[in-house]
């Protein structure tokens, strides 16, 4: 089975299992509470719409849009045309970590953003490979799909955390037996919801990792000769992140690694070779939103070799 067909099969399987698991758990919860199913469905749709509408403004803060004529915009425009999707709006983000991301909706316009540190550490080929990955997310509607599948675990998680916090507060300040029992009940229900959230997140994260791999697949098949550059881009991001020093109390970056082009290129190539020969457990990234870098690099090179 080739890489593309395998990814599509696994995405169908993981997506189906995620929807079934979320459906069963939601049905059990609303049945116990006694809320009509139709009201629950309407409530979820409204929440999804609110999230869909406001997310671009939250994600897009601290960004600056670039337009036609800007080199970054022209790269994205070329990739979008070859991917057969409308050109998204293009932004430079002034976040402190090297990253690129796709976001937006049909009202605000689909968007692609690249952080300034990423622009500083990648060469032209690596940047094109990364942007092809992000355009792949837009082509595959990953923003909308990911938001929909993540909605139910998010709601259950918020309710669970609220009950746990309230339960502990009641226990701490309990003035009589009723408040003590109520606090214990909230802790018990909150604990159950926490476990359910964790289990659902396992499914959602599995699906998310496959969508990331599918975006890698889009980049590597659109520009097959640039697959190694996506690998070195991942390595440079990893190296940069490992060398960032942050304040342990505020999380603010104290120092970031200086950009040394020759050393950066050599270190990235060495890390890619390490990943290619590294044995990774199937469960190494079970709690991660993205596949382990070694898995991503191995897939990219398998596409390059036509296996």
UniProtKB/Swiss-Prot annotation:
GO terms for molecular function: metalloendopeptidase activity; zinc ion binding. It is an enzyme of class 3 (hydrolase). Its cofactor is Zn(2+). Zn(2+) binds at residues 133, 137, 212. It comes from the Archaea. Its main location: membrane. GO terms for biological process: proteolysis. It is a multi-pass membrane protein. InterPro entries: HtpX_protease, Pept_M48_protease_HtpX, Peptidase_M48. Disulfide bonds: none annotated. Binds 1 zinc ion per subunit. Keywords: Cell membrane, Hydrolase, Membrane, Metal-binding, Metalloprotease, Protease, Transmembrane, Transmembrane helix, Zinc. The chain crosses the membrane at residues 7-27, 38-60, 145-165, 180-200. GO terms for cellular component: plasma membrane. Belongs to the peptidase M48B family. This is Protease HtpX homolog 1. The lineage of its organism: Archaea, Thermoproteota, Thermoprotei, Sulfolobales, Sulfolobaceae.
